[in-house]
Amino acid sequence: MIAVCIATYNQEAFIAQAIESVLMQVCDEAIRIYIGDDASTDGTSAICEAFAVQDERIQHIRRSVNMGLVSNTIELYRRIMADGCEYIAMLDGDDYWTDPRKLQKELDYLRTHPDTGFVHTAVEGQGDEPIPTGDLRDRYNLAGARHTNCTVLFRADLLRPNELDDIERQGFPVLDYPLYGLFAQRTRFAYLADPTAVWRDHSSVSQPSSRRARWHYRRERLRMWHWLDKKCPGHFHFRYDKAILWYIWHFFYILFA
């Protein structure tokens, strides 16, 4: 069973396209869609519920209070683990898949490479900034390699409840980097060059808009890299140093701009 994990909040303009892109998948493995609706206040909940009523593979889990992206996603992981799904595919509520065989291609790779637990692909960009390109390595390396979360498929047994608890306690602004950094200590990562998804990158969805919010976000990311550097000695020190330099530059930019 492949669990498709969709975390969403106030994305009524995008969520239907995201769900439909999963439903169009042609795959020889059963698919179940878990939608973590983080107490949306727009039309997102109604759209998700309409899909869930029509297709029993869709579980619409609407939070009674807003939990934030990290806790919302971790709660989905806990539910997926309890249901015994073997694989987890990630899809943010504002992105969508473009290749109807996206899951099948990634699944085939994992089946034929038992030493690999995580696969991601190229992506098409839609938004304010171009998709960064560069050296993408089989072994996850945050100093060089990049991933786009909407392309990721990984083995569910990589998840550890104690690690999820630890990350949640830290209160980081993002989940993918610290979690996948821990994954990299026990499995290989693979990159497939064919684009399979569209990633929307714009300020209203992907990043804080005010200077104060951006400052806080950068500071929290710096704390995240420091945590990873301690958890995985030798693997992320370069990335931590780079985050420090970026933090200093951003401080002076906000101070004098």
Task: Indicate residue ranges for each PLM-predicted region.
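Conserved donor NDP-sugar-binding/catalytic core segment of glycosyltransferases
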Residues: 100-131
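A conserved acidic beta->alpha catalytic loop
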Residues: 37-46, 65, 92
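Cell-envelope/extracellular polymer assembly enzymes that use nucleotide-activated donors
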Residues: 1-3, 32, 178
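Short, acidic, metal-binding catalytic loop of nucleotide-sugar glycosyltransferases
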Residues: 20-30
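Conserved short acidic donor-positioning loop in nucleotide-sugar-dependent glycosyltransferases
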Residues: 10, 22, 38-39, 67
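Glycine-rich, basic loop-to-helix element that forms the pyrophosphate-binding segment
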Residues: 63-83, 105
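Short beta-strand-to-loop acidic/aromatic patch adjacent to the donor-nucleotide binding site
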Residues: 85-94
